Swiss-Prot record:
The gene is rplO. GO terms for cellular component: cytosolic large ribosomal subunit. NCBIfam families: rplO_bact. Keywords: Ribonucleoprotein, Ribosomal protein, RNA-binding, rRNA-binding. Residues 21-31 have a biased composition (Gly residues). Signal peptide: none annotated. Belongs to the universal ribosomal protein uL15 family. Binds to the 23S rRNA. The lineage of its organism: Bacteria, Pseudomonadati, Pseudomonadota, Betaproteobacteria, Neisseriales. Gene3D superfamilies: 3.100.10.10. This is Large ribosomal subunit protein uL15. It comes from Neisseria meningitidis serogroup A / serotype 4A (strain DSM 15465 / Z2491). One of its GO terms (molecular function) is structural constituent of ribosome. Pfam families: Ribosomal_L27A. HAMAP family: Ribosomal_uL15.
Length: 144
C-alpha cells in the first residue's frame, strides 16, 4: 500500500451539490435559496449575533465579574492534608511534590480544618491563628 494509491471506500464520498444548473436538476434557478430577501443575494449574510438592528443578546446582558490573576498563585491547605505527608519538614516544594498544590502556586496558607496528630515543621508557609494553635499543640513549629 502506498499513500498515492489510497482511496475512500465505495459509497463513502458523495458528489457536491451542483446548484443553478437548470430546472431538471432540482436545484436550478434559485439554487435552493428561495425567492428574494437578504439571504438569497450573494454576500447577503450578516455577522454572528446580528439580530436585525435589535440590541444583540451579548450587549443586552450585563457584564459580570473578572478573572483574578492572583487566584492561581494562592492556595489554602487543611490541617488534615498535612497529616498525609510523610515528611516532617514541610515547605512549598514538598507540597508540590506531594500533589497537594498546583505547580503555579507561590503562596500557601494552612487553615484550621480537620485534625492533626503529628508534629510538623512548616517553612515559608502562612497559617491562621487556629491552625497555628493546633500545630503547636501537637509539638509542631512554624518558621517564616
Amino acid at each position: 500500500m502506498f499513500l498515492n494509491t489510497i482511496q475512500p471506500a465505495v459509497g463513502a464520498t458523495h458528489a457536491g451539490r451542483r446548484v443553478g444548473r437548470g430546472i431538471g436538476s432540482g436545484l436550478g434557478k434559485t439554487g435552493g435559496r428561495g425567492h428574494k430577501g437578504q439571504k438569497s443575494r450573494s454576500g447577503g449574510f450578516h455577522k454572528v449575533g446580528f439580530e436585525g438592528g435589535q440590541m444583540p443578546l451579548q450587549r443586552r446582558l450585563p457584564k459580570r465579574g473578572f478573572k483574578s490573576l492572583t487566584a492561581s498563585a494562592n492556595a489554602q491547605l487543611r490541617l488534615s492534608e498535612l497529616e498525609s505527608i510523610a515528611v516532617n519538614e514541610i515547605d512549598i516544594l514538598v507540597l508540590k511534590q506531594a500533589g497537594l498544590i498546583a505547580s503555579t502556586v507561590s503562596n500557601v496558607k494552612v487553615i484550621a480544618f480537620g485534625e492533626i496528630s503529628k508534629a510538623v515543621a512548616l517553612k515559608g508557609i502562612k497559617v491562621t491563628k487556629g491552625a497555628r494553635a493546633a500545630i503547636e499543640a501537637v509539638g509542631g513549629k512554624i518558621e517564616m
